[in-house]
Amino acid sequence: MSTPSSLQALVKKVLATQHISKEHYFILKYCGLWWHGAPIMLSTNENNQLMIKSAIFKDGLDLNLALMKAVQENNYDLIELFTEWGADITSSLITVNTEHTWNFCRELGAKILNEMDIVHIFYKIHRIKTSSNIILCHKLLSNKPLFQNIEGLKIIICCFLEKIPINFILNEITFNEMLTRYWYSMAIQYNLTEAIQYFYQRYSHFKDWRLICGLSFNNVSDLHDHIKKVDMNIDEMMYLACMRDSNFLTIFYCFVLGADINRAMVTAVKKFYTNNLFFCIDLGANAFEESLELAKQKNNDILAELLSFKDYYSSNASLLSLKTTDPEKINALLKNYKSKNIMRYKKLSRK
């Protein structure tokens, strides 16, 4: 049988999912569904993940992250409420800042954190990709001594950053800067506009980081918004766009601006990115001799065979007809893009 406390938590949970008119806000205040001068709301995202929303976290927080914020504020009613709604009370010990709150969380069941607990919590709290969530992750976890010497956490962040063509040496920056760049790059990867602006305004000294991440994560919209504010050679930008396979949007954008598509083709061969290679051919690249020689030097029989059918490949007129840097038009053009040259290769290679 449910206890009065659990029934009360359930009623509050149901109430928090309802649309409540302003004249009935007093009910929410009375029930403790009130945070920073506004109602607390519960919702789920497209992945059916539970989110906390409020006036200052309007696009949603992970429930565990909301708990960590309530702990930082020593808000005991919300600590208890979020725990009853399913937040992991152990995560509260990351942001606890008073002995009284520490004891309160321990009474609710919080366990002493070990390294694996911290890594697990780190993973959980940024599953929800919203501006509110990423910004609060940054605010709550920056300059935390608890995080400084956890090797597993450093490995996770370094592995993520190493996938981006970084313009610095990871071993020469602090862990806190690593973590900040991690959140900043995630904001760009998921095109979280508010979070991008937040990091851009506060970390302008991270030279070209926004541009590098936009190119790397195929975010043509943010690239278009930001490109006039930076000074970078267009071929260098194309090179950065080619550092991941299937980055069609940003490769096309750089191509329209005048980047050398033959150099992009050679880069695709060096990286063994066949999708980028065919896309470059579709855009008119014809550096077949150099590419074939490079493939042979690398003893890459797959690329050598692919390039041997050069006489059967041709550029894609529909791609070449659109000379625009408008992100919406580029997205529409490439939304269902499939290379006809790949289809030709597959037919020829089966003969």
From Swiss-Prot:
Organism superkingdom: Viruses
Alphabetical list of InterPro entries matching this protein: ASFV_MGF360
GO BP of this protein: taxis
Functional summary from the UniProt entry: Plays a role in virus cell tropism, and may be required for efficient virus replication in macrophages.
Family: Belongs to the asfivirus MGF 360 family.
Name of the protein in question: Protein MGF 360-2L
Species per Swiss-Prot/TrEMBL record: African swine fever virus (isolate Tick/South Africa/Pretoriuskop Pr4/1996) (ASFV)
